[in-house]
Amino acid sequence: MTCDKEKTRGIRPGDIAVVVGTGRSGVAAARLLHAKGARVRVLERDAANVPATFAEWAAGAGVEIVCGAHDAAHFADAAVVVPSPGVAVATLRPYLPATGGPEVMAEMELAWRELSGEPVIAVTGTSGKTTTVSLCAHMLRTQGLSVFLGGNIGTPLCEYVLEGKRADVLVIEISSFQLQTCSTFRPRVAMLLNITANHLDYHADMQEYIDAKFRLFRCQDEDDLAVFGEGLAPLVDRYGVKARRVTFRATDRFAESRLFGAHNRANAEAAWTAAREFGVTLENALQAVATFAPMPHRLEQVAERGGVLYVNDSKCTTVSALRVALEAFDRPVLLLAGGKFKGGDLEGLIPLVRERVRAVMLFGASREVFEAAWRDVVPMTWDATLEEAVRRAASAARQGEVVLMAPATASFDLFRNYGHRGDVFRAAVESLA
């Protein structure tokens, strides 16, 4: 596993730079490339996705926006291509020259090359990234350090560079999508929380997904820190990680917390492992965890009515995430599940479902998948909408139970995204009589 820093050409004034996508990271990349003197061309398949404010800025800045299907001519003269995180690199290959083509780099990589030496904590993993980086940033701020928190969560790193302010530490959430096109990115602390099957609609296979995750460590050396969750040691050895290695696991050290579940105690340990590299004391770490508010849509308590707890875990989009959600509660669960199923072993959850789930209220798509796995294990019902499923669960719930929405699916059957799904759940709970 080697770093590609010797292979990079850099971006020079007058170079043509192509940005694919006009989401927040694409817009930030286009602005930074323009500031560096590049001639910027932005590609967007759907003109309706181009923000009006960006279109206005681009017109004044001389930045070209091309809408519609991609064409090889759009890339032929480019020195660099920056795809938005949701754009699979493989889908661009047919348009790129077979040899001597442009450097393809993530928005994160582009911004990294413009930093002024600020230390970076970068966190990846199949699940737990957002909670862990947010906890870590809260610990650092409790210690009195200035922190930029961003990347795959909220603010793109290019926006930080453009703003010009400087922080003591940058805490970055980074996805496999972004890592695939990072070539010189070198965090002071790099963290891999876990790996389970996910995003196989984007990656060619599980091996490509794992390869992407381990790109986070490829430019580190012995002066850096590599942090891993339990069970990853065989992979760490296989990829030859050079940095100092530390493994974290859940303990009771951070038991005073508003977060549910052992997995969140593990997330707190992971955050503390990184934060103490920058002088954060245990006292301040404990204070930070105790005052940390749960992240929206991640085992988020939205209400307690008549002794029944209502929990929104809309970010639960996989079977492995459902296991974690169910293990977080020691009281009976009425489970709301359903949506666009991404695959996974529902049968493997049968012992846990039998032990902890009193009833399953399905909604939306994938009804047949869940029923095939669990129809002989637990009582199941189905409703066309989430709102109907919430009302059904509320009427059946008893004092001391949990109504848990942990869908184990993508949200795109009925909703714009998992956040929209979580908001609908919250509104449905709030509307209960």
UniProtKB/Swiss-Prot annotation:
Record field: catalytic activity: UDP-N-acetyl-alpha-D-muramoyl-L-alanine + D-glutamate + ATP = UDP-N-acetyl-alpha-D-muramoyl-L-alanyl-D-glutamate + ADP + phosphate + H(+)
GO biological process, one term: peptidoglycan biosynthetic process
Gene3D superfamilies to which the protein is assigned, alphabetical: Mur ligase, C-terminal domain, Mur-like, catalytic domain, NAD(P)-binding Rossmann-like Domain
Enzyme class name: ligase
One GO CC annotation: cytoplasm
Pathway assignment: Cell wall biogenesis; peptidoglycan biosynthesis
Residues the entry annotates as binding ATP: G125, T126, S127, G128, K129, T130, T131
GO molecular function: ATP binding; UDP-N-acetylmuramoylalanine-D-glutamate ligase activity
Pfam families, A to Z: Mur_ligase_C, Mur_ligase_M, MurD-like_N
EC number(s) recorded for this UniProt protein: 6.3.2.9
Cellular localisation: Cytoplasm
Primary localization class, coarse: cytoplasm
Role of this protein: Cell wall formation. Catalyzes the addition of glutamate to the nucleotide precursor UDP-N-acetylmuramoyl-L-alanine (UMA).
PANTHER family for the chain: UDP-N-ACETYLMURAMOYLALANINE--D-GLUTAMATE LIGASE
Protein name: UDP-N-acetylmuramoylalanine--D-glutamate ligase
Lineage: Bacteria, Pseudomonadati, Thermodesulfobacteriota, Desulfovibrionia, Desulfovibrionales
Gene that encodes it: murD
